[in-house]
């Protein structure tokens, strides 16, 4: 028995060293392609002028920390979820609440609008993803029509519909992501590869939508093929949890925000990190990131209650937005790019333009 154990340990050690040497070779190959820096290419690009954005609407109604939000494709409605166990659908123009659902658990960490605008999905510490159809009848009991779609073995950290209402992608504290059929609740594909809790995901913006990116507590951002379930690219340059990932509008790159107080840009074609957005004065983690419609600006919410706006090409900060009275937990640009909404632990959401 002892010799078996010894043999196993030797095999493990040799496999580990082989993996390390392969990692080294990969890094060498990546370095060969690294012939220019983004800021050098951007030197010819004109700098952005003075940039002013203000809070245009404040959405009040949650009784505790706002944890997640998403825009409807109609560019007007917003869904938000909170630690108070409530999920609220808002009219961002009037600040009216159109629907409210009380979940069976507190800490509703994930919510998403269906592409049709006719349903919302949400979940959190109940380990599952629930889909609620939205109707115009205010008296109808939404909870009665609830569908439980996804079941994880730990908390649900993020969810997103694919390009139709029929499938939903989820990320969980159990270290996996999964693709589910909404109608049957059947698991279509699972994605294993993160070494710790998965905290965020984002679907590629292409019409086919066959890839998505995820980030987690293992400091990694991973790109997945939804058809095969395989990880096709992995990036491990952050020094702490990856809290947020967002595809560049063209789909050729993505940004990440981390507890290491930096945001980073990864080019998928160059297969490497191409920019870091940080300042010595920023010492708090970035909780949420999103791009402007053109991709020139990166909005990032931080745990020091601020929102920083970065010039993606130059790597410089062009604006800093104050207003929230606690950490900014979630942030999304509207589908038409005219505004963005932020949610905070101060119990409110703010629409900026």
From Swiss-Prot:
Coiled-coil segments on the chain, per record: none
SMART domains given in the database record: WD40
Organismal lineage: Eukaryota, Metazoa, Chordata, Craniata, Vertebrata
An individual GO BP term: light adaption
One family name in Pfam for this protein: WD40_Gbeta
Protein known as: Guanine nucleotide-binding protein subunit beta-5
Location(s) in or outside the cell: Membrane
PROSITE patterns attached to this UniProt entry: WD_REPEATS_1, WD_REPEATS_2, WD_REPEATS_REGION
Tissues in which the UniProt entry reports expression: Detected in brain.
Source organism: Rattus norvegicus (Rat)
Main localization of the protein described in the UniProt heading: membrane
Keywords (A to Z) from UniProt: Membrane, Repeat, Transducer, WD repeat
Family: Belongs to the WD repeat G protein beta family.
Gene Ontology CC entries for this record: cell body; cell tip; cytoplasm; cytosol; dendrite; heterotrimeric G-protein complex; nucleus; parallel fiber to Purkinje cell synapse
Assembly mode: Component of a complex composed of RGS9 (isoform RGS9-1), GNB5 and RGS9BP; within this complex, the presence of GNB5 stabilizes both itself and RGS9 and increases RGS9 GTPase-activating protein (GAP) activity. Interacts with RGS7, forming the RGS7-GNB5 complex; within this complex, the presence of GNB5 increases RGS7 GTPase-activating protein (GAP) activity. Interacts with GPR158; promotes the GTPase activator activity of the RGS7-GNB5 complex in absence of glycine, in contrast GTPase activator activity of the RGS7-GNB5 complex is inhibited in presence of glycine. Interacts with RGS6.
WD repeat ranges, renumbered to this chain: 61-100, 103-142, 151-192, 194-236, 237-276, 278-320, 323-352
One GO MF term attached to the UniProt entry: GTPase activating protein binding
Role, per record: Enhances GTPase-activating protein (GAP) activity of regulator of G protein signaling (RGS) proteins, such as RGS7 and RGS9, hence involved in the termination of the signaling initiated by the G protein coupled receptors (GPCRs) by accelerating the GTP hydrolysis on the G-alpha subunits, thereby promoting their inactivation. Increases RGS7 GTPase-activating protein (GAP) activity, thereby regulating mood and cognition. Increases RGS9 GTPase-activating protein (GAP) activity, hence contributes to the deactivation of G protein signaling initiated by D(2) dopamine receptors.
């Amino acid at each position: 028995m002892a010799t078996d154990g010894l043999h196993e340990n030797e095999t493990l050690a040799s496999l580990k060293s082989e993996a390390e040497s392969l990692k080294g070779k990969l890094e060498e190959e990546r370095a060969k392609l690294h012939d220019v820096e983004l800021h050098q290419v951007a030197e010819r690009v004109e700098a952005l002028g003075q940039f002013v954005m203000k809070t245009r609407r404040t959405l009040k109604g949650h009784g505790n920390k706002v944890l997640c939000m998403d825009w409807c494709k109609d560019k007007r409605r917003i869904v938000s979820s909170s630690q108070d166990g409530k999920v609220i659908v808002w009219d961002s123009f009037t600040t009216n609440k159109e629907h409210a659902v009380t979940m069976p658990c507190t800490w509703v960490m994930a919510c998403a609008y269906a592409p049709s605008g006719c349903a919302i999905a949400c979940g959190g510490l109940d380990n599952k993803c629930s889909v609620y159809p939205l109707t115009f009848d205010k008296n109808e009991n939404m909870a009665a029509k609830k569908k439980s779609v996804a079941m994880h073995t730990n908390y649900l950290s993020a969810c997103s519909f694919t390009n139709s209402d029929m499938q939903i992608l989820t990320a969980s504290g159990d270290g996996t992501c999964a693709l589910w059929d909404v109608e049957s609740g059947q698991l279509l594909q699972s994605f294993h590869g993160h070494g710790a809790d998965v905290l965020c995901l984002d679907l590629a913006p292409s019409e086919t939508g066959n890839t998505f990116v995820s980030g987690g507590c293992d400091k990694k951002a991973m790109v997945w093929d939804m058809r095969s379930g395989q990880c096709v690219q992995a990036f491990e340059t952050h020094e702490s949890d990856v809290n947020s990932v967002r595809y560049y509008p063209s789909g050729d790159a993505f940004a990440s925000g981390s507890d290491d107080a930096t945001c980073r840009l990864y080019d998928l074609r160059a297969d490497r990190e191409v920019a870091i957005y940080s300042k010595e004065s920023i010492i708090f983690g970035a909780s949420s990131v999103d791009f402007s419609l053109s991709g020139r600006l990166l909005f990032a919410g931080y745990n020091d209650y601020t929102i920083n706006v970065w010039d993606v090409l130059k790597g410089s900060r062009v604006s800093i937005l104050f207003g929230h009275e606690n950490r900014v937990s979630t942030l999304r640009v509207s589908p038409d790019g005219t505004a963005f909404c932020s949610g905070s632990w101060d119990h409110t959401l703010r629409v900026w333009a």
